[in-house]
């Protein structure tokens, strides 16, 4: 498995070569790959590698190995629901093919990973079309973190909406919040959009209110790592603040995410686990410590935006209000 090392962008484009599920889990944990749909896809390929490693085991040993690999992968990033969703699909497939041996097991899991990958790309295009009509004909769209091709199987969720709008002839430019402390907006969103020829400017996270106050921003579009049944949205830390600002300034606040990001088993955002990451990711910048030794650092990686602040959610099923989410019936999930 070859994986673009996102931590080194935009300075260098380098691919990791991963040969087992443990390597994939480490790449997810350390954010060499990130973005809820992308880590779900990566986990699916990781499960295919686990199936390959256990291809000659007896049925019970094979299933045990697959469950262990799945548990390891699912534990790496607890907030993103796509990760567990992809692992459960892979374990369900492993239960079904446990009676087979050899390469057939590995081939079936590899094909499932490719299927999950294809589904995500198709979903991104569908939600892009659903959201494009809601963006203004011209002006500036604000986005946060990176919800583009790098965070998905391709095309993107929030950036997919922007791409689709521009492909439809709308004259839009993008303001990308830098997104401290990992700088996904500055490093990844700006890199993607520049490569696509889409006008983009980077601002610090604290500048968003100023540009809203000046009337420069016509819409906010972000991705999501998990959406609860009531429509609460967990996304990169700082999203909630942008939603509050958008409401104050009368700016529509949109969320774009595949249906796999909607967790109907979680009643509200209060039940979504919020990942706490290392203090050094915040306290060390460019190899230099910027926080005095001994001073505590808090580093929640995500926050929760209440449903009432979300104008609409764009999925492959079309535009949904947060109230409509709770009334939706999810596709049947594989057992396992």
Swiss-Prot record:
<comment type="pathway">
    <text>Amino-acid biosynthesis; L-methionine biosynthesis via salvage pathway; L-methionine from S-methyl-5-thio-alpha-D-ribose 1-phosphate: step 1/6.</text>
</comment>
<feature type="binding site">
    <location>
        <begin position="34"/>
        <end position="36"/>
    </location>
    <ligand>
        <name>substrate</name>
    </ligand>
</feature>
<dbReference type="GO" id="GO:0019509">
    <property type="term" value="P:L-methionine salvage from methylthioadenosine"/>
</dbReference>
<protein>
    <recommendedName>
        <fullName>Methylthioribose-1-phosphate isomerase</fullName>
        <ecNumber>5.3.1.23</ecNumber>
    </recommendedName>
</protein>
<dbReference type="InterPro" id="IPR005251">
    <property type="entry name" value="IF-M1Pi"/>
</dbReference>
<dbReference type="InterPro" id="IPR011559">
    <property type="entry name" value="Initiation_fac_2B_a/b/d"/>
</dbReference>
<dbReference type="InterPro" id="IPR037171">
    <property type="entry name" value="NagB/RpiA_transferase-like"/>
</dbReference>
<dbReference type="InterPro" id="IPR027363">
    <property type="entry name" value="M1Pi_N"/>
</dbReference>
<feature type="site" description="Transition state stabilizer">
    <location>
        <position position="145"/>
    </location>
</feature>
<feature type="active site" description="Proton donor">
    <location>
        <position position="225"/>
    </location>
</feature>
<feature type="binding site">
    <location>
        <position position="77"/>
    </location>
    <ligand>
        <name>substrate</name>
    </ligand>
</feature>
<keyword id="KW-0028">Amino-acid biosynthesis</keyword>
<feature type="binding site">
    <location>
        <position position="184"/>
    </location>
    <ligand>
        <name>substrate</name>
    </ligand>
</feature>
<dbReference type="InterPro" id="IPR042529">
    <property type="entry name" value="IF_2B-like_C"/>
</dbReference>
<feature type="binding site">
    <location>
        <begin position="235"/>
        <end position="236"/>
    </location>
    <ligand>
        <name>substrate</name>
    </ligand>
</feature>
<comment type="function">
    <text>Catalyzes the interconversion of methylthioribose-1-phosphate (MTR-1-P) into methylthioribulose-1-phosphate (MTRu-1-P).</text>
</comment>
<keyword id="KW-0486">Methionine biosynthesis</keyword>
<comment type="similarity">
    <text>Belongs to the eIF-2B alpha/beta/delta subunits family. MtnA subfamily.</text>
</comment>
<keyword id="KW-0413">Isomerase</keyword>
<dbReference type="GO" id="GO:0046523">
    <property type="term" value="F:S-methyl-5-thioribose-1-phosphate isomerase activity"/>
</dbReference>
<dbReference type="InterPro" id="IPR000649">
    <property type="entry name" value="IF-2B-related"/>
</dbReference>
<dbReference type="Pfam" id="PF01008">
    <property type="entry name" value="IF-2B"/>
</dbReference>
């Amino acid at each position: 498995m070859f994986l673009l090392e996102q931590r080194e962008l935009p300075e260098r484009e380098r691919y990791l070569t991963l040969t087992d599920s443990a390597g994939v889990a480490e790449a997810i944990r350390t954010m060499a790959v990130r973005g809820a749909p992308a880590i779900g896809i990566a986990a699916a390929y990781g499960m295919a590698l686990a199936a390959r490693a256990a291809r000659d085991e007896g049925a019970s040993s094979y299933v045990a190995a697959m469950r262990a690999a799945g548990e390891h992968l699912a534990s790496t990033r607890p907030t993103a629901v796509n990760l567990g969703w992809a692992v459960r699909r892979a374990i369900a497939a492993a239960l079904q093919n446990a009676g087979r041996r050899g390469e057939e097991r590995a081939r079936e899991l590899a094909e499932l990973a490719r299927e999950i990958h294809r589904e995500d790309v198709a979903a991104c295009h569908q939600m892009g079309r659903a959201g494009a009509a809601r963006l203004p004909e011209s002006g500036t769209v604000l986005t946060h973190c990176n919800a583009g091709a790098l965070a998905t199987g391709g095309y993107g969720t929030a950036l997919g909406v922007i791409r689709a709008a521009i492909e439809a002839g709308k004259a839009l430019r993008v303001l990308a919040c830098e997104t401290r402390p990992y700088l996904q907006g500055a490093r990844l969103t700006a890199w993607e959009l520049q490569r696509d020829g889409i006008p983009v400017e980077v601002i610090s996270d604290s500048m968003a209110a100023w540009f809203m106050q000046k009337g420069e921003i016509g819409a906010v579009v972000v991705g999501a790592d998990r959406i609860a049944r009531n429509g609460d949205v967990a996304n990169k830390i700082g999203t909630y603040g942008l939603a509050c600002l958008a409401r104050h300034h009368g700016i529509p606040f949109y969320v774009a995410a595949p249906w796999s990001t909607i967790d109907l088993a979680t009643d509200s955002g209060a039940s979504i686990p919020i990942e706490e990451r290392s203090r050094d990711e915040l306290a060390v910048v460019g190899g230099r410590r910027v926080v005095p030794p001994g001073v505590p650092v808090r580093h929640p990686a995500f926050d929760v935006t209440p449903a009432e602040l979300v104008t609409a959610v764009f999925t492959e099923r079309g535009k949904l209000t947060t109230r409509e989410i709770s009334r939706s019936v999810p596709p049947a999930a594989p057992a396992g």
